[in-house]
Amino acid sequence: MRRLLQVLLLLGLGLGLVTLGMDYVLRGAVTPPAVVSLRGLTAPVAVSELPGHVLRLNAQSASDAWVAVGYVHGRWHAWPLLLWRQAALGQQAEWFGLSVLPFDSLIHTLRLPTTAKQAFEALPEPTRRILEAYSIGLNAALQEQTVHLRDELVLLNLPIEPWQPWHSLALERLLALLALPDSIDTALPLLAPLRAWLHLYGFRHSVAWIHTGPNQQPVFFQRHVYGNLALPFFQEVLLNYENSSIWLVTIPGTLLFPAGQTERQAWCLFLTSHRARTEQHPRASLPLQPVYERLRLPSGDERLLHMEQAAAYLVLREPVPDTVRVLWWPGLQPISDLSAWLALLTDQTASFQLFDGTGLRIEATGQSQVLGTPSVVEPIPGGLLVGQTFWHRYLARRLRELPLSPDPPSEDHHSLWATERLHLLLTLLDTLHTSDTLIQEAYAFLRNWDGTYDRMSIGATIFETWLAHYQSRYDSLPPFSFPDISLRVQLKQALHFALQDAVATLRKSLGNDPNRWRWEHAHPLRLMFPVWAYRTNLPAAHRYAPFLLPGEGHPSTLRWNPSPLLNDRPAPAHWEGWIYSPPGKRFYVRRWWPQLDRFLERYRTLKRELETFSLDPTNTPLRQFTLQPKR
């Protein structure tokens, strides 16, 4: 009897393993039909999925190419683009209830759906046809059973409504809103929570540079930071049509291309916008008009919102009689940056109105050009760096001192900022008199730390925690220059207290053994899944739990990682790409792309580095199919 039970147990175990293996194989390689019929096409389009989830589209016309882009966006990214559309239309409460109704109210107060629809109607006819072609392909994908059975849509029991051409402009507006600077959050107090809910923020930490390798060949590197979203935010697409070959880094649901290259140029455009401000005016000085928007409630009822607006001015409040506090934002008017994004494909330039349009481009000749007016422009060997925060100046300094290399030095973990600050602070602290052996050990680690934020660094953890406690206690970082002699005693005492607090925190969170205080454990990368991050009672909560990845890097190092010293929400999610000039020769990408429907994917990802792959059209496709006109 015991032997029979053992045999049955082994058979059951074997059957379970086979089932799991089949599930892994089938889910990891869902093969579309060999031929998919679509209305709106004039000729067949060949679709190839290359290694790294890169998509190659071979079309005979630009119109067919945009239909295909819409189709692959819908097939590969249905859940995030539908969620973003629901947010952009101010209809999240219909899906998720009253708790997100304030977000819908914000969207309708800013009139995003209304102005997006008006902006579409104001576009030139050829541009409208591009959006119409894109929506045809996207709707075709959204009607497929494979998309309807996507796990998130099934688990949340969400309906799929048709995609209207102007919906892409609503998403463009939503992203421009999320990209506004934190300084506007006081005027729009719901904006920061909306960013957190969608996990899209931190765009100001994006950076780009061009440097020269040892063979005098320019290398164009760019990094786009976009919050803590665990889902892919970008989709790389190779478009071949009408004798043109264009690499595009696209955002699903939109025709925004933050990165790309044609045969004549490559570009990086930051998803940032500083085109908003608050002002105070006498009421009579503005031609204010009443405007109304309907806010739909989960019950099906509607609430009428009343605002006052004059062109790009929206009244926020009336602090005193006859005086209004207003928000000025171009997104309040029926405009779009679509023409500026499309101009990149034909090597032309056009002005941006919603986004800043700042970034960097390089021509096939090797000539570089700064786009817009980024706040940081620094010379580096054989090129320049453009960025948006003071941290980026330290990146430029580090690039100036590194030896020339054919590879982008984005794996460098050394911080000039930390090295300089540590030297000064240890000089001010001088000697440490304490009987606490753990504080003594921490002090020894600081004195021997080389300013490197790699995974194994213990000094990095102690240093950051030390400064974070000082910042929390005194509302600022320590002065990074020698103060007057009369203030040094006070500063030394303050640094001592902060170090005591830091060690107490590390002891409590990571234990008494400093060898466990490694940077990878103290500050892991935490990537989140929309909705599940805030609704722990949903089905499949374990599958969509946060991804915790080993921490490495810092805002002041070439390897990016958030810091507890930043006053904003940590933004570990990022996409990196680099191109060897002349454009069109070699294009490499590094990013995360979790696939939760694969067996043990969560645990496989934890042991993997960022995936690096080449955007090479000659790569052997993993799968292929054809989009053909529907007769």
How does the language model describe each region?
Residues 2-631:
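C-terminal/peripheral segments of proteins
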